[in-house]
C-alpha cells in the first residue's frame, strides 16, 4: 500500500510518563548523538503522519521549541499510556474531526521505521482488525499502534468506569493485527528507558548515520 493510498493519519507522541528508570525529568529531551529523543521521533513520524500532537503533563512551555500542540492527560494521577492515547483521541475529535485513525508512539523510541503507518494500515485491512500493533523479536509493543478514532468513548469508559490501566487489557477487547518488523541491523522499536539504553541508542544513531 503506497503511503498516499492509506487514510490521512494524525499521530500522538506519548511523553506523559514519569521517567522513573531515568531518574525522573524529561526523558524525551535527553540527547543522543546531538539530537533529542523527541526530535528523532518527530523526524521519523512527520513524513508518515499529516498531523502530530504531543501528550505531556506539566508545563507545556518546555516543549515549545518543537512546534507541536501539547495535550495533557485527561485523567488525573498519571494512569499510564492509555490516558495519553485518550488525550490524542480527544484532541483529534476537536481539531481533526475528519480523521478516522490515529497512530500512537512513545517519545523514547528514536528509530521508528519509515514504513510504520503504511504497514499498520495494510495489516488492519488484510486482517479486518480494529487495532494494529507493532511487534519485533516476537514481542508486541502495544503503545505503538494504529487506533480507530471511534474508540474514544469506549476508552474513556474503560479508564474512568472500568479502571483499566494496561494497554493490552483494553486492546484485547477488539480484533487486533500484530505486525512484525525485523530487528536487523537494529530493533526499530528500541526504547531508551535507562541511562544504559541512552548510551546504546548513541551507538546505534552513530552507526546508522554512516
Swiss-Prot record:
Coiled coil: none annotated. GO terms for biological process: bis(molybdopterin guanine dinucleotide)molybdenum biosynthetic process. Its main location: cytoplasm. It catalyses: Mo-molybdopterin + GTP + H(+) = Mo-molybdopterin guanine dinucleotide + diphosphate. GO terms for cellular component: cytoplasm. GO terms for molecular function: GTP binding; metal ion binding; molybdenum cofactor guanylyltransferase activity. The keyword Magnesium applies. Mg(2+) binds at residue 108. Keywords: Cytoplasm, GTP-binding, Magnesium, Metal-binding, Molybdenum cofactor biosynthesis, Nucleotide-binding, Transferase. The keyword Acyltransferase does not apply. InterPro entries: MobA-like_NTP_Trfase, Molybde_CF_guanTrfase, Nucleotide-diphossugar_trans. Its cofactor is Mg(2+). It is found in: Cytoplasm. GTP binds at residues 14-16, 27, 55, 73, 108. Its EC number is 2.7.7.77. CDD domains: MobA. It is an enzyme of class 2 (transferase). Belongs to the MobA family. Monomer. Transfers a GMP moiety from GTP to Mo-molybdopterin (Mo-MPT) cofactor (Moco or molybdenum cofactor) to form Mo-molybdopterin guanine dinucleotide (Mo-MGD) cofactor. The N-terminal domain determines nucleotide recognition and specific binding, while the C-terminal domain determines the specific binding to the target protein. This is Molybdenum cofactor guanylyltransferase. It comes from Rhodopseudomonas palustris (strain BisB5). The gene is mobA.
